[in-house]
């Protein structure tokens, strides 16, 4: 058995599960991680049976600051060499920013931000030693969009993640390491239900919603091609192009129109 593995966070559903499935279909061993152990166990069994690869899992919550170190220790105990790192774990917060607690926001930052940095930092030295590494950070078109007061930190964190991915490419490409920021738009997953925004998702036109399977395939293909940024589908490529050329004043107005009633009532 090869000891080379792809580590996929947030692998129990949605884009993470589809990325794990697509990687397994390419004959790559997978280490799954997410909070829901039963789902991980079932997915591991299904993937290993379907694609004849080794699939293992470790249940953990990336809002726990020790989780990245626990994952690394697990890999070392099994002699797993992680040469593909998929930073996918994430969620949304529906509550307006001024109504959330600081603990809510700190947890949010740990899952979407700090854990990505920590996992990348932990596994990077081994990738440098092996002169080989593929990193994906599942970001969002929200990185290019005006922020809303419902998810005030979501877009800014994704913008930071895109720049962090750029930094990895600039500093470590000479070591055989590339990083890809995958920036999908509206994707049909459990994300919107678990984040309490399914009603808003239902109002999105069908031509702007895409399957997690398609997003995963485009993202993984871009990662193996060494692309720095992947915006899946022509629909969102065009949207991002518009967002980049619009003046900041127009983007701010657009953001206010997307904000909850406290703006729209004025």
Describe every region a protein language model picked out.
Residues 26-43:
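Conserved glycine-rich Rossmann-like NAD(P)H-binding loop of the short-chain dehydrogenase/reductase
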Residues 88-93:
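Conserved NAD(P)H cofactor-binding loop of Rossmann-fold oxidoreductase domains
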Residues 96-98, 104-109:
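Substrate-binding pocket helix/loop in short-chain dehydrogenase/reductase
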Residues 120, 156-157:
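Active-site helix of classical SDR
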Residues 140:
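Residue(s) in the substrate-gating loop at a strand-loop-helix junction
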Residues 181, 202-239:
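C-terminal helical subdomain
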